[in-house]
Amino acid sequence: MKIYYEDSLPYAAEFFAGLGDSQVFSHKDVNGELVADADVLLVRSTTKVNAELLKANQNIKYVGTATAGTNHLDKEYLRSRGLDIHSAAGCNAVAVAEYVLSALFVMAEKLDWQLTTKTVGIVGAGHVGTRLTEKLTALGIRYHLCDPPLADAGDTRDFVDMDTIMQCDIISLHVPLIEGGQYNTGHMFDAKRIGQLRKDQLLINACRGEVIDNKALLKSFESGYKLNVVLDVWENEPDIDQALVPYIALATAHIAGHTVEGKARGTEMLYQQVCEQFGFNATKKLSDYLPAPQPSIITLDETLSGQAQLSALVLSVYDIRKDSKQFKETIEQPDQFRYIRKNYSIRREFAALSVNTGNYSGSEAIYALGFNRK
């Protein structure tokens, strides 16, 4: 069996060794001729899988993406070939939720907010939105959920409408890109909805760039409209509108889900799917390959308490300001968006770390965030 995998899949060589003849490729070089004899094709969002790529391949039996999103897969074409759509839905949900927490604590400091007095409106209650609700609950932060497709499908959680979301202090977007139809999310935040935002609100987009009309957002800023916006995703990536960048409070290069665990978990999920489809025993686990974080134990600063303590802890693991600073200072360089994503620094999830809480009274909140006890 011929297995071709993109070079950006962490630990793919280790996971797929022994399942067949494994070949690695770069998204920059991949073409139909290169993968013409592939039985299994494993990609990330940088490789578009369509008729052009697979027209010369008569062997393909499995196509999988080690990402939660599938917009780079031509689903109609793959189904016409009798191929299911395989993805790693939820693989980076924890990572994105922790990215949002970092943004919240940074913006709370900037805006002099006590987060427990604020309400977060979460649009999209799938994998990421659900993980975010768990983190917010641990911190005692109120939230509302809006997800019409899930509500209509019978999900029994307490959902609100977008009018209610627009009244929240913080709005965090976690929807898939759906263009057209009843549940359209393309330009969900168009000029009209952007115009409804208040200067004392915070808007976070860590899902798909096209969910916010970037041209309308830029026009609002240029007209003097004051908004607090955090963007990890942009329209027309990687060729984004650089004129928008200086106006964004925290700006990053679509890396919210790029923890070591988040990316590698996608590879593990594809490994499990391939084993199931082809009758192999899935004996390998992500924990077999993940390195121990350095340091692996965090000791709380006993001079801090409350939000300051939690903020210091979260930002010691991941401080979004560093990524935003690099992004803003270098994005004008050629192909920098891709470069940042490709060469992203090591970032670990809370669950990889243990915390020595000492006599801190809020230790249960820390463990509920996902940290381990020391």
UniProtKB/Swiss-Prot annotation:
Enzyme class: oxidoreductase
This protein's pathway: Cofactor biosynthesis; pyridoxine 5'-phosphate biosynthesis; pyridoxine 5'-phosphate from D-erythrose 4-phosphate: step 2/5
Domain of life: Bacteria
Transmembrane region(s): none
GO biological process, one term: pyridoxine biosynthetic process
Plastid found in the keyword field: no
Keyword Nuclease (UniProt): no
Subunit structure: Homodimer.
Similarity comment text for this entry: Belongs to the D-isomer specific 2-hydroxyacid dehydrogenase family. PdxB subfamily.
The name this protein goes by in its record: Erythronate-4-phosphate dehydrogenase
Natural source organism: Pseudoalteromonas atlantica (strain T6c / ATCC BAA-1087)
